[in-house]
Structures are given as structure tokens and as C-alpha cells.
Amino acid sequence: MRVFIVKANEAHTDYDFSLKDLPGTSGRIDLICRALNSAFHLSHSFRKNVRVYVTLLGPPSPPKTIRFEGPKLRPKILNPDELSIAKVIIKALNAGKNLKGSSTKELEVLPGVYVSNMTFEDVIRKNIRMNLYVLEEGGADIMKVKFPRNNVAFILGDHIGLSEEDLKTLEGIAKKISIGPKAYLTSHVISYVNIHLDRIGVP
């Protein structure tokens, strides 16, 4: 199983934004939609070996974490266009209004789609037994990293990135790696990682 853990620093946690202007009104949920597209969609098929956690930390009621579980997801639920994916996120946020407190309990919204009040740190703890990698400039060249055959998890930020506090939290538990010398779009990083794992035969 491949896991991607994405921190969405400003993504709204309620449906108080316009679908006609996702970049300008949603805290860049459009970036999350593209990241999900890159995580799951191939040209003529759908990746069932992927799990994605997105922790939304924007207004008005952070945090909200949405988990997308590839083995249970139906491709018709997560269509490749941004608008369709945004509507799935909205459905999860609306369902998440019923969650109270800081519980890590998840609520299934659709087959393979779950929402919770988990923090970014909760998600990391939940995946602590995975082989954790954090995508950051200055990390080890991904081409030179020897990945295990399974249970790999990749942690990355949105356009804002991970904070210094996040990186300190991850020290000693996640290996810092990089796909190149520049800052890349989250969706592009996920695509690159997926392609690289395909190439080297990691399921």
C-alpha cells in the first residue's frame, strides 16, 4: 500500500466557498483536487493500492481530515475532474459537522471516503508503523533511496508547505527525500512518486 499524507494549511473546513472560484474562495481546495487526481487516476485505470489522507486546517472549524481509501473507492465516485472531486470533499465536510471534539473516530461518507477531526499529528501517529518519508527540498535524491516492498507513506505540504514545527516533529521518524532541486506542485510530486514506485516495482 502507498500512502500520501497531505497537509492543507488553508483549505476550508466547511462548504462556505464557491465551486466557480475554488482557487480564490476555498483556501486552495483546487490543489487538493489535483493531488487526489494524481494519486489515483491513470490514463485508463484507477490505482487501488493508494490511500490518501488530507488534513484541512483552514476556517471555520479545523482540523478536518478526509481519508480516501483506494481499495474501497469506486472510480465513478472520484472522477478525474476538479469539480467532481470538490463535490466529494464538500460532502465529507458536510458530514463532518456531526463530529464533535478531538476524537479520531472516522465517519464513512461514501465507499472509501472517510472524515474525522484528526489533526495532522494524529494522522502521523496513525501511520507511525509505516516506512515514512517527508518530501522536502534538500532531502535525499529519491532515485538513490532504497524503498521497501510495501507500507510506504509520503508526507507533503500544499503550496505553503510544512512548517518548521512539522519538520521537527518528523525528525527521527521520517526520512527526508526530494524529487528534485526546486519546489514543485503537490500534484506533480505525487505523480512523480507514483511513477517512480511503478518503475522500481514497489506495489
From Swiss-Prot:
GO molecular function: S-adenosylmethionine-dependent methyltransferase activity; tRNA methyltransferase activity
GO BP terms in the entry: tRNA methylation
Residues that, per the record, bind S-adenosyl-L-methionine: L135, G157
InterPro entries: Alpha/beta_knot_MTases (IPR029028), TrmY (IPR007158), tRNA_m1G_MTases_N (IPR029026)
Keywords, ordered alphabetically: Cytoplasm, Methyltransferase, S-adenosyl-L-methionine, Transferase, tRNA processing
The enzyme's E.C. designation: 2.1.1.257
Pfam families on file: Methyltrn_RNA_2
Subcellular location per the Swiss-Prot or TrEMBL entry: Cytoplasm
Top-rank taxon: Archaea
Gene Ontology CC terms: cytoplasm
Catalytic activity line of the entry: pseudouridine(54) in tRNA + S-adenosyl-L-methionine = N(1)-methylpseudouridine(54) in tRNA + S-adenosyl-L-homocysteine + H(+)
Subunit structure: Homodimer.
PANTHER family reported in the protein's UniProt record: TRNA (PSEUDOURIDINE(54)-N(1))-METHYLTRANSFERASE
Recorded family membership: Belongs to the methyltransferase superfamily. TrmY family.
Purpose: Specifically catalyzes the N1-methylation of pseudouridine at position 54 (Psi54) in tRNAs.
Annotated protein name in UniProt: tRNA (pseudouridine(54)-N(1))-methyltransferase
Organism: Pyrococcus horikoshii (strain ATCC 700860 / DSM 12428 / JCM 9974 / NBRC 100139 / OT-3)
Gene coding for it: trmY
